[in-house]
Amino acid sequence: MHLSYHSRFTRQLARKKKDLPLLEGITITGLAGEGKALTHIDGKVLFVPFAAPGDVCDIQITKKKSSFMEGKIARIVTPSPERTQPICSHFTICGGCKWQHLPYSLQLQSKDQVVRDALQRIGKIEVGEYLPILGSVETERYRNKLEFTFSHKRWLFPEELDVLNARSTPPEPYELSGLGYHLPGMFDKVLNIDTCYLGAEVMDEIRLFVRDYCSARPEEYPYFDLRKQEGLMRTLMLRTTSTGEIMVVVVFYREDEAARTALLTALQERFPQITALLYVINGKCNDTIGDQEIHCFYGREYIEEEMEGLRFRIGPKSFYQTNSRQAYELYKVAREFAELTGSERVYDLYTGTGTIANFVARQCASVVGIEYVPEAIEDARVNSEVNGIDNTLFYAGDMKDILTTDFISEHGEPDVIITDPPRAGMHEDVVATILRAAPRRIVYVSCNPATQARDLQLLTATGEYSVTKSRAVDMFPHTHHIENVVQLVRR
């Protein structure tokens, strides 16, 4: 067999399941975290991906622990009336979307409940008012950034294996290579994507053009072999804005000027609307480009997003919320919770490229923004400059090292603190400094309700602050991810 790696994986999976039962006629009763559904069997919780409440299924158990089990649908006996038809042919394989089979109203209901469970059960937080969850107007084609991986070894479907293995000659490299998303749990394989309904249609067009161009010239453009660390084509990043601008970043493993120039020239000619055509030579073991030099082949080194008359520059390394339209709704909630009157000194923690800082700057006296990434702070300063905003100051460094009592003494005590930390939440030292600063209001924006609940415990432990409002904002339809904004007021 030419493609033994796939059969090895199948045999390994079969061995793992050998002693685990197949449960028949199981009714799914609800939804759980991380995009899974659940039911209860003999006092244990059973988690099942891609199931819907009301489904009656035969379920193959894949993991069995003392308090819970995990399984996969072997057969849907009776589909739930809640089930909808997924829009994507890659659904259940790709791993990017977990809930395309559920109506959006049910997705929102589940996400809202996840937030409430986190605050009430994990944090034991008393919330004055839960405002209705803000759903996304766009549930398809809403992402402004997508990243794809070139791999010499793509995921092959059983029918593809049958065809290739029936041949007397080994498959050509282009028949095994792919450009798409990493499969969950399989670091060296990608799913060759035809259409991704998360990004703009032009993203599909550009990705398919690059894939077809390189696949037609396998000797010149070998796809990357992650295990052997060899090949040329590594990753492709695409970004778009609501203003119609497009950024393309092609990452090569090594320099090959002739091949690189030919590909980028072909891209430029086929898509003259590209605003920023960039490339990177990344010879490291991993795919991250944060520490790599960015080269501009054509156009600008950035694209611009617009929000409420403000323009924000976005570079290849910049963080910007991946749902532009819904980011505006998120920031409006944060600004509303800040209750600015024009006289306040605001601290914007984890400011990124200064989007929130600049968004609220015209409604307050001054803003101090702090962010770990120096390049992001440079973008934040530029964003203030291009928008004629002169009441912002930005500082780069580790939050717990920058935000100190001395820093606050130098820059003035904040009336309002807006904090939007990464998924890990805030360091305990940062929480302690916020409490010492004693702002009148704290607005906590979070992409992880569990760590937000943990931090809210610390912020409310002394009794100085109460949580007055909470509002979930859905930035990522068809996924389990959710943003939540909380207002704390000093008693």
Residue ranges with predicted function:
Residues 1-86, 90, 393-394:
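Terminal RNA-binding accessory module
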